[in-house]
Protein backbone atom coordinates (compact mmCIF):
# COMPACT_ATOMS: atom_id res chain seq x y z
CA UNK A 1 0.00 0.00 0.00
CA UNK A 2 1.02 3.62 -0.36
CA UNK A 3 1.11 4.05 3.42
CA UNK A 4 3.43 1.07 3.84
CA UNK A 5 5.71 2.25 1.04
CA UNK A 6 6.11 5.72 2.56
CA UNK A 7 6.70 4.30 6.03
CA UNK A 8 9.23 1.81 4.66
CA UNK A 9 11.21 4.65 3.10
CA UNK A 10 11.01 6.67 6.32
CA UNK A 11 9.22 9.48 4.48
CA UNK A 12 7.27 10.91 7.40
CA UNK A 13 6.67 14.22 5.64
CA UNK A 14 4.79 12.50 2.83
CA UNK A 15 3.10 9.98 5.12
CA UNK A 16 1.44 12.59 7.27
CA UNK A 17 0.67 14.88 4.36
CA UNK A 18 -0.70 12.30 1.91
CA UNK A 19 -2.17 9.63 4.17
CA UNK A 20 -3.46 11.39 7.27
CA UNK A 21 -2.31 13.55 10.14
CA UNK A 22 -2.86 13.83 13.87
CA UNK A 23 -2.94 10.98 16.38
CA UNK A 24 -4.53 8.57 13.92
CA UNK A 25 -1.72 9.12 11.45
CA UNK A 26 0.92 8.62 14.12
CA UNK A 27 -0.73 5.40 15.29
CA UNK A 28 -0.84 4.00 11.76
CA UNK A 29 2.78 5.02 11.09
CA UNK A 30 3.93 3.33 14.31
CA UNK A 31 2.00 0.13 13.51
CA UNK A 32 3.64 -0.11 10.09
CA UNK A 33 7.08 0.63 11.54
CA UNK A 34 6.62 -2.09 14.16
CA UNK A 35 5.65 -4.64 11.51
CA UNK A 36 8.64 -3.69 9.40
CA UNK A 37 10.80 -4.06 12.49
CA UNK A 38 9.57 -7.64 12.96
CA UNK A 39 10.46 -8.44 9.35
CA UNK A 40 13.93 -7.03 9.92
CA UNK A 41 14.36 -9.23 13.01
CA UNK A 42 13.34 -12.29 10.99
CA UNK A 43 15.88 -11.44 8.28
CA UNK A 44 18.62 -11.00 10.89
CA UNK A 45 17.82 -14.43 12.33
CA UNK A 46 18.47 -15.97 8.90
CA UNK A 47 21.94 -14.45 8.76
CA UNK A 48 24.72 -17.01 8.41
CA UNK A 49 28.41 -16.49 7.88
CA UNK A 50 31.02 -19.07 8.79
CA UNK A 51 33.59 -16.34 9.42
CA UNK A 52 31.52 -14.58 12.11
CA UNK A 53 32.70 -16.57 15.09
CA UNK A 54 36.21 -15.19 15.48
CA UNK A 55 35.75 -11.69 14.12
CA UNK A 56 34.35 -8.42 15.43
CA UNK A 57 31.93 -6.41 13.28
CA UNK A 58 32.08 -2.71 12.59
CA UNK A 59 29.01 -1.02 14.06
CA UNK A 60 27.82 1.91 11.96
CA UNK A 61 25.49 4.54 13.38
CA UNK A 62 23.32 6.61 11.09
CA UNK A 63 23.31 10.31 11.95
CA UNK A 64 19.89 11.86 11.15
CA UNK A 65 17.12 10.34 13.22
CA UNK A 66 19.58 8.34 15.32
CA UNK A 67 22.03 10.86 16.79
CA UNK A 68 20.83 14.18 15.34
CA UNK A 69 17.23 15.42 15.28
CA UNK A 70 16.54 16.26 11.63
CA UNK A 71 12.92 17.17 12.25
CA UNK A 72 13.92 19.27 15.24
CA UNK A 73 16.13 21.21 12.84
CA UNK A 74 13.19 21.68 10.47
CA UNK A 75 11.03 22.96 13.34
CA UNK A 76 13.72 25.46 14.28
CA UNK A 77 14.12 26.58 10.68
CA UNK A 78 10.38 27.20 10.22
CA UNK A 79 9.74 28.48 13.74
CA UNK A 80 7.01 25.95 14.52
CA UNK A 81 6.40 23.86 17.63
CA UNK A 82 6.08 20.60 15.69
CA UNK A 83 7.01 19.82 12.09
CA UNK A 84 3.65 18.11 11.47
CA UNK A 85 2.08 21.57 11.51
CA UNK A 86 3.78 22.05 8.15
CA UNK A 87 1.86 19.13 6.60
CA UNK A 88 -1.52 20.88 6.84
CA UNK A 89 -1.09 22.58 3.46
CA UNK A 90 -1.54 19.70 1.03
CA UNK A 91 -1.12 21.95 -2.03
CA UNK A 92 2.66 22.10 -1.71
CA UNK A 93 5.43 19.51 -1.85
CA UNK A 94 6.81 19.90 1.65
CA UNK A 95 9.78 17.59 1.13
CA UNK A 96 10.91 19.50 -1.96
CA UNK A 97 10.44 22.81 -0.18
CA UNK A 98 12.56 21.71 2.78
CA UNK A 99 15.29 20.29 0.56
CA UNK A 100 15.39 23.49 -1.48
CA UNK A 101 15.74 25.55 1.70
CA UNK A 102 18.56 23.50 3.21
CA UNK A 103 20.56 22.85 0.03
CA UNK A 104 23.83 24.77 0.05
CA UNK A 105 23.46 25.78 3.70
CA UNK A 106 24.96 24.72 7.04
CA UNK A 107 21.65 23.12 8.10
CA UNK A 108 23.13 19.78 9.13
CA UNK A 109 25.67 21.43 11.41
CA UNK A 110 22.83 23.11 13.34
CA UNK A 111 20.73 20.02 14.11
CA UNK A 112 19.77 19.41 17.74
CA UNK A 113 21.41 16.42 19.37
CA UNK A 114 19.16 13.70 20.74
CA UNK A 115 19.43 13.31 24.52
CA UNK A 116 20.06 9.60 23.99
CA UNK A 117 22.98 10.08 21.57
CA UNK A 118 25.86 9.70 24.02
CA UNK A 119 24.23 6.73 25.75
CA UNK A 120 23.71 5.07 22.37
CA UNK A 121 27.39 5.49 21.52
CA UNK A 122 28.37 4.10 24.93
CA UNK A 123 26.12 1.08 24.33
CA UNK A 124 27.80 0.38 21.00
CA UNK A 125 31.30 0.85 22.41
CA UNK A 126 30.55 -1.57 25.23
CA UNK A 127 29.56 -4.14 22.61
CA UNK A 128 32.57 -3.62 20.34
CA UNK A 129 35.20 -3.01 22.99
CA UNK A 130 35.45 0.73 22.34
CA UNK A 131 34.80 1.33 18.65
CA UNK A 132 32.01 2.85 16.57
CA UNK A 133 31.68 4.41 13.13
CA UNK A 134 29.21 6.68 11.32
CA UNK A 135 27.47 5.81 8.05
CA UNK A 136 25.18 8.62 6.88
CA UNK A 137 23.61 9.64 3.59
CA UNK A 138 24.36 12.98 1.91
CA UNK A 139 21.61 15.31 0.79
CA UNK A 140 20.78 14.45 -2.79
CA UNK A 141 22.17 17.08 -5.15
CA UNK A 142 24.26 18.62 -2.36
CA UNK A 143 26.70 15.82 -1.55
CA UNK A 144 29.91 17.72 -0.86
CA UNK A 145 28.30 20.55 1.10
CA UNK A 146 26.01 18.36 3.21
CA UNK A 147 28.89 15.97 3.94
CA UNK A 148 31.01 18.89 5.13
CA UNK A 149 28.40 20.08 7.62
CA UNK A 150 27.47 16.60 8.78
CA UNK A 151 31.13 16.04 9.66
CA UNK A 152 31.15 19.40 11.44
CA UNK A 153 28.11 18.34 13.47
CA UNK A 154 29.89 15.14 14.42
CA UNK A 155 33.05 16.97 15.53
CA UNK A 156 31.01 19.46 17.58
CA UNK A 157 28.54 17.08 19.23
CA UNK A 158 29.99 13.61 19.81
CA UNK A 159 33.33 11.95 20.37
CA UNK A 160 35.35 11.22 17.26
CA UNK A 161 34.28 7.95 15.61
CA UNK A 162 36.73 5.50 14.09
CA UNK A 163 35.37 6.23 10.62
CA UNK A 164 32.87 8.61 9.01
CA UNK A 165 31.24 7.38 5.82
CA UNK A 166 28.99 9.70 3.82
CA UNK A 167 27.40 7.72 1.01
CA UNK A 168 24.14 7.17 -0.79
CA UNK A 169 24.91 3.43 -0.87
CA UNK A 170 25.31 2.44 2.74
CA UNK A 171 24.92 -1.24 1.90
CA UNK A 172 28.37 -1.34 0.27
CA UNK A 173 29.73 -1.43 3.84
CA UNK A 174 27.46 -4.27 4.97
CA UNK A 175 30.30 -6.80 5.07
CA UNK A 176 33.98 -6.51 5.90
CA UNK A 177 35.80 -6.59 2.58
CA UNK A 178 38.67 -8.59 4.03
CA UNK A 179 37.01 -11.19 6.27
CA UNK A 180 33.43 -11.19 4.99
CA UNK A 181 32.17 -10.50 8.51
CA UNK A 182 28.64 -9.02 8.52
CA UNK A 183 28.78 -5.48 9.88
CA UNK A 184 25.99 -3.81 11.86
CA UNK A 185 23.97 -0.76 10.83
CA UNK A 186 21.77 1.16 13.28
CA UNK A 187 19.43 3.28 11.16
CA UNK A 188 15.97 4.85 11.38
CA UNK A 189 14.87 4.03 7.81
CA UNK A 190 13.55 0.52 7.12
CA UNK A 191 14.61 0.69 3.47
CA UNK A 192 18.24 1.28 4.49
CA UNK A 193 18.13 -1.69 6.85
CA UNK A 194 16.57 -3.93 4.19
CA UNK A 195 19.25 -3.03 1.64
CA UNK A 196 21.92 -3.60 4.28
CA UNK A 197 20.55 -7.04 5.06
CA UNK A 198 20.26 -7.90 1.37
CA UNK A 199 23.99 -7.14 1.06
CA UNK A 200 24.79 -9.55 3.90
CA UNK A 201 24.84 -7.22 6.90
CA UNK A 202 22.97 -7.16 10.21
CA UNK A 203 20.52 -4.31 10.76
CA UNK A 204 18.92 -2.66 13.78
CA UNK A 205 15.96 -0.37 13.08
CA UNK A 206 16.12 2.45 15.63
CA UNK A 207 14.46 5.86 15.65
CA UNK A 208 15.66 7.96 18.57
CA UNK A 209 12.42 9.88 19.06
CA UNK A 210 10.28 6.73 19.34
CA UNK A 211 12.51 3.83 20.44
CA UNK A 212 14.33 3.12 23.68
CA UNK A 213 17.96 2.06 23.85
CA UNK A 214 16.75 -1.37 24.93
CA UNK A 215 15.87 -2.00 21.28
CA UNK A 216 19.50 -1.45 20.29
CA UNK A 217 20.78 -3.57 23.18
CA UNK A 218 18.49 -6.45 22.16
CA UNK A 219 19.62 -6.10 18.56
CA UNK A 220 23.27 -6.30 19.54
CA UNK A 221 22.53 -9.28 21.78
CA UNK A 222 20.83 -10.92 18.80
CA UNK A 223 24.00 -10.53 16.74
CA UNK A 224 26.04 -12.04 19.56
CA UNK A 225 23.66 -15.01 19.71
CA UNK A 226 24.13 -15.61 15.98
CA UNK A 227 27.90 -15.58 16.54
CA UNK A 228 27.62 -18.14 19.34
CA UNK A 229 25.49 -20.42 17.17
CA UNK A 230 28.07 -20.60 14.37
Where are these regions (language model features)?
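Structural recognition of alpha->loop->beta junctions
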Residues: 150-166, 221-227
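A structural signal for isolated positions on well-ordered beta-strands in alpha/beta enzyme cores
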Residues: 131-135, 163-165, 184
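Conserved Lys-Pro-Asp/Glu-containing loop-to-beta segment of HAD-superfamily phosphomonoesterases
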Residues: 165-196
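Substrate-recognition element of Asp-dependent hydrolases with the DxDx(T/V) motif
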Residues: 109-113, 117-150, 154
